């Protein structure tokens, strides 16, 4: 017996020691997690239809009213009731199995299925329901104690009322006029001053219990004089204040309704709790005086959601109760699938906050998904998933049908709002972390914030912790944090959040709310692995401006026997969707903000793309175009091109220095106009006139073995694949080889062999590839077309033509004959002309066509003339834009952000 006890004691002690060792080792060693970007084509984690209880607990914040309970505890301690077909369900609950119909009078407004709540927020607040819930077949329901909900998660319950009832009613069912009418209040003048009257009203109505704080609040109330016709608040602006009319009359326009508030009126009570007046317009009907008090001021004096008078909602409109009982608020996790391609459309999804992505579009807060499919009874034409934590409200199609039947004009109003919602811009949330040995993430973040300007908000780890009240992983606080970010995103275009530790638990938390993760470092390094659906971009820091050569291929003695095939995107960028090169801090420049401004434009979606067309020596005009753009302060964020445009574009992308472009292009032109170099490269013309060796050496001497993905600017070039008869877009690989392939004019140079492909001049299929640039998230595209041949006054030589005739005419005649290179470029332009006509209709594409009619394809010896022609043509075009007023329209977003500069830096 003693030996048995001793044995048990030894086992227990050994286990404890092992546990301590494990605990100690885990404390001393940080276990990294990897951040891995997931594409929407992959299977999403959870679908919304028919969710299990386990999945629903993670996605319905309402389940947090008894935190810490497991599924087994919930199923064992909560009451489960089975209802037969047609039975009425009176209590609130969650559907474990079956279908439940919700009827309003004689109308079926909703059918809820497994994985849904039966009740709306008003029922949980203790008010009687207006609809009737009936079981369709056998239904199993998990009943909910409403008093327990009210006691434990009041904020979540209030959020449910706001998100799935009030906000939907105002934005898509046009009930804001009912709310405006209901909240109209008047203060009776009892002889006190207007300010004292307003303070007394706020104290009593909002239950503030000011006492000693009344004098402090008095100083925070704003008095404003408003002239007749002056706008106080425009539509699409948020309203978060309550207003007292001291004198005059205030006109409130809500949809098709108009309300007039006279002396003593108070308006804006609902706006203190809900963001529902964004669509109304407020202006002075006559000269007026008003007092304003914002919600941010009242929060300091104890205003919170528990002090909202819910009874004000009871008599507004019966539609509000129907919406509350039918619509459902859910909080999706990154990767959750809203709809799968081919599914029948039964619901409309309103995105309250967050982001949802499909193959063709990305939808953010304030937009609707599935509206068209629901109205016209179509199936989903593509799958959609949440890319971060996203608030969605499920609106059943039966509810829409009810409103269509009730109001014949509803279809027109609803569809108008449905399609208008997709145009609303919302702030982007960007998390910033250091990787590798880089530590100065705070300075980087502040510099980026400065480049973006007043339209950005910068938050540190400490700021986030304060917002969360040190309860970062509580569901209620997560909902509060989401609401805070949503409110800020309506005020700011970018919210920057930086975290000093890449292995921080807070980072895991923030990634679920982020649209973009910026990894900042001096060298390419793997970042921690963790599955996320947001964009992951890398910012590589330099101390001097130079073309990156970190991943360049080692030089080969024989240029034509180097690496042959294109690197895959995975090998080139690894985990990153985009790579930015940033000079910070600069060893050679005191103030260097050009790269930060470029990064800022990328995050804001305001990038400027430059597309350079092919045209042989005429392409030298691109140098003058770039110089003119730089002098006018028009930035270039990414470059693409074909043939000669690919060459000039690569030169500029390499160092962002137009002097470097000028110098290297002139050196190249000298070689191309040197008859001896050309003669030495002649070969037996079975495949081509020249072997291409001299041409290759010229390009290699300029670009070396650098890679496209290491160029300072994002770059691409176009080639024609004569094996598959398709155009190829090259975004990575060796620069000189793909520039050479893009310049490979058939008959002159042999095709480039690339992984069983034969690549020739890209101009045959796409001479000005603006369509490719359109897919690179740019706001404006400047295209330069130098290949257009405007002159057609060639001599009619008949059916045959001798080359000796052309040669003789060159010295002793003045007739104009068509040449081989001109024929090549005219052929190339046949397929391009159709694309150019389509692009001209796009308002975001700016077309430049320098007058180069007198210059031929091989006129490299006229380098200075052609460059000057491109420069002057661009300066004239910009002067014309300014005279016509189109310059401000085209580049308005760059005015305050990008300073005018004289030199490339």
From Swiss-Prot:
Summary of activators and inhibitors of this protein: Inhibited by organophosphorus esters.
Sequence ranges on the Cytoplasmic membrane side: 22-905
CDD domains the UniProt entry points to: Pat_PNPLA6_PNPLA7 (cd07225)
GO term, biological process aspect, one: phosphatidylcholine metabolic process
Binding, a nucleoside 3',5'-cyclic phosphate 1: 198-319
Sequence motif DGA/G, residues: 761-763
Residue span of motif GXGXXG: 614-619
Protein's UniProt name: Lysophospholipase NTE1
Annotated source species: Encephalitozoon cuniculi (strain GB-M1) (Microsporidian parasite)
High-level lineage: Eukaryota, Fungi, Fungi incertae sedis, Microsporidia, Unikaryonidae
Gene name tied to this protein: NTE1
